[in-house]
Amino acid sequence: MFYKNNLLILLIIFMFTFFEKVDAKYEKLFFDHSINNINNETIDLNQYKGKTILLVNVASKCGFTKQYTGLQELYKKYKNRGFYVIGVPSNQFGGQEPGSNSEIKDFCETNFNITFPITDKTDVKGDDAHDLYKWAKKNYGNSTVPKWNFHKILINKDGKIQDTFNSFITPMSDKITKQIDLIL
């Protein structure tokens, strides 16, 4: 019994250490990167310097896909205050984003009237993850690595990670809107 309790305590300590938020010393900032948009044109993220960003990996055939509505609503609510949503389609979670960039763009515009920027389809975790997601993990830890579609990373005006939100936290939730209000 004593052994099991100690093992459990060690496991809990390991989990908190493994998943804790890192007080990062950034070598690079969010704005020091680029990513291709849905039309395969380079987006220099430096254009968002001084803005607040919600970076979200998205998918068209996921149970969380309805969150596109909340993301668009969030974008409309805060865009005049220097806030942007950037959607990053990825097919890494259950093959739920199988379409081409053209199909993804059409899906987003037709079904959700999306007006916020969408990138081209890219990997968001693992060795082949886009450099932006590798940067996030390096500087903020494992909480930035998406576990499923519609994982959210909030970037502050300084180009640093403010917070992360799992797929179950909806875009218009108090957890997200309070953080945005705090840093805008």
Residue ranges and their predicted role:
Residues 1-9:
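Bacterial N-terminal signal peptides that target proteins for export
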Residues 9-17:
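Bacterial N-terminal signal peptides
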Residues 22-46:
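N-terminal "domain-start" segment that seeds a small globular fold
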Residues 37, 57-61:
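Amphipathic alpha-helical repeat scaffolds
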Residues 49-54:
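Local sequence-structure signature of Cys/Sec-based thiol-disulfide redox active-site neighborhoods
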Residues 64-129:
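Structural microenvironment flanking redox-active thiols in thiol-disulfide oxidoreductases
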Residues 131-134, 138-184:
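Thiol-/selenol-based redox modules, centered on thioredoxin-like
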